[in-house]
Design a protein with these regions (language model features):
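Residue-level signature of transmembrane alpha-helical entry/exit and packing/kink sites
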Residues: 5, 9-13, 96-105, 109-112, ...
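Small-residue-rich helix-interface/hinge motifs
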Residues: 5-87, 397-419
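Terminal peptide-recognition signature
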Residues: 24, 62, 108, 148, ...
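Internal alpha-helical transmembrane segments
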Residues: 69-146, 198
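Juxtamembrane extramembrane loops of integral membrane proteins
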Residues: 74-83, 91, 96, 139-210, ...
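Functional transmembrane alpha-helices
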Residues: 88-99, 218-255, 259-394, 411-428
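PDZ/PDZ-like peptide-tail recognition elements
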Residues: 106-138, 179-180, 191-193, 200-235, ...
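PDZ/PDZ-like domain segments forming the peptide/carboxylate-binding groove
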Residues: 123-161, 165-168, 218-255, 259-262
Length: 428
């Protein structure tokens, strides 16, 4: 049954991804028909057609490679390499005015933007899931070997600003998030304004980069912290130390060895340290309903496999707790997406940040994100929200003045207006 579940999710990803590309290409197609351009082919998917038919001089085809689609427009020769080779030589057709070329090129991004707005209205109605960890800037865990700890940050501190920019949450869904501001920070030190015990303080952290192989893209800046969220036991192995101590599903651990904890990562880190040191008992303060009590758990190594590290027997922590639905307006969603796209482009082209073109994700990364979202609780709502951001990205990035993008076609058409003759195909 699990295999069918994964296959179904994969099919959802393929269909949704192709919907986004198909709508974009539909914009080009309808604009070309409106402006009277010759259309050889409107194809969904690539490769040799497994089905095709001709209606009104246009061949409609379905390829066998499920990765988008294209419109073959012989009068827009610069599109052939990207959107399919035409069967009709361009020189046998009447020329197309620069205005018509611009309209056809703009129509694709316009349809992507309209699809983003459509998704935004749906999200406004059904809501977007958000968790306690998404909506806080309080630190739940700090890696004791990381830059944040060295700079003086501790669990329970609340981050107020990064490099002078106020932050409102941890999740990198907008420019006012802790994660986003760390990733796009500039300079050798990251200035972090935080509050502890009612007092505002400053910390200066040296960014950390996760080691990568030569063939991998360079990792982005981190300070190795996690947001605060309740430590709720999701599942306990039977006959494990945790089970023998009386811990059960749904228990909330509020303190460890007398110290308040703000994240289950604190417990996991304490257990990990026992792999290279002595195994010490951990005393947890547990909240179960309205009751509060202490339980002491001594981790031990599982019998199988023999080289396993010590374990408490807690299979999983319920990280996505206190999930609620927010209903951002379409304007708020589109404005946030536009801001994030422009912010990303600014970071990519800035010589002062570590964000480069290599960090931008392609089709594989997009498919992976969709796959993970579909697997998450309320995944379909998350997918709708992400589709707003993705379509705004698709619309704006395609308007960049690069030859392989719609913006490149617009630029060439503007050059044609200035020169009063088309750009030579030998230059493209």
């Amino acid at each position: 049954m699990m295999a069918f579940h994964y296959i179904f999710i994969a099919l959802e990803v393929v269909l949704l991804f192709n919907l986004l590309i198909g709508v974009h290409e539909l914009g080009h197609f309808l604009a070309a028909k409106w402006r009277g351009l010759k259309i050889d082919r409107f194809a969904i998917w690539f490769g040799k057609p497994i089905w095709k038919t001709k209606i009104g001089g246009v061949e409609y085809a379905l390829g066998w490679i499920p990765a988008g689609g294209y419109v073959a427009l012989p009068q827009m020769a610069t599109m052939e390499a990207i959107e399919g080779k035409s069967d009709t030589p361009a020189e046998k057709l009447p020329p197309v005015s620069p205005l018509d070329k611009i309209i056809v090129a703009v129509a694709g991004p316009l349809f992507s933007f309209l699809l983003a707005v459509s998704f935004a209205f749906v999200v406004w109605g059904v809501g977007k899931p958000t968790t306690e960890g998404d909506n806080t800037t309080q630190i739940g865990w700090v890696d004791p070997t990381g830059p944040a700890w060295t700079a003086g940050l501790r669990p329970g501190d609340t981050i107020l600003a990064i490099d002078g920019y106020p932050v409102k949450h941890f999740a990198p869904t907008s420019q006012d998030s802790v994660t986003w501001r760390i990733i796009t920070s500039e300079g050798p030190k990251i200035a972090i304004k935080y509050r502890r015990d009612g007092q505002e303080k400053m910390a200066y952290a040296t960014p950390y980069y996760h080691p990568t192989h030569w063939y991998e893209r360079r990792s982005l800046r981190q300070i190795l912290v996690a947001p605060a969220e309740p430590s709720i036991v999701d599942e306990v192995f039977s006959n494990s130390p945790a089970a023998e101590a009386g811990l059960t599903n749904g228990d909330i651990i509020t303190a460890m060895n007398g110290q308040k904890i703000f994240s289950p990562f604190t417990i996991m880190s304490a257990v990990d340290e026992m792999s290279n040191g002595p195994v010490k008992p951990l005393t947890f303060t547990v909240q179960r309903g309205s009751d509060h009590f202490d339980r002491t758990v001594l981790a031990r190594k599982p019998l199988e496999p023999t080289n396993s590290p010590p374990s408490l027997g807690i299979v999983a922590w319920l990280l996505d707790t206190n999930v609620s639905l927010v209903h951002p307006t379409p304007y708020e969603q589109v404005q946030s997406s536009l801001s994030q796209v422009f912010g990303t482009l600014g970071a990519v082209f800035s010589p002062k940040t570590d964000v480069g073109v290599q960090q931008l994700g392609g089709a594989v990364m997009i498919a992976r994100v969709y796959y993970n979202l579909f697997q998450s609780p309320d995944g379909w709502r998350q997918v709708l929200w992400f589709s707003v951001l993705l379509n705004v990205n698709l619309a704006l990035l395609n308007m960049l003045p690069l030859p392989v993008l719609d913006g490149g076609h617009i630029l060439l058409s503007l050059i044609e207006v200035i020169r009063r003759r088309p750009v030579s195909a030998r230059l493209l």
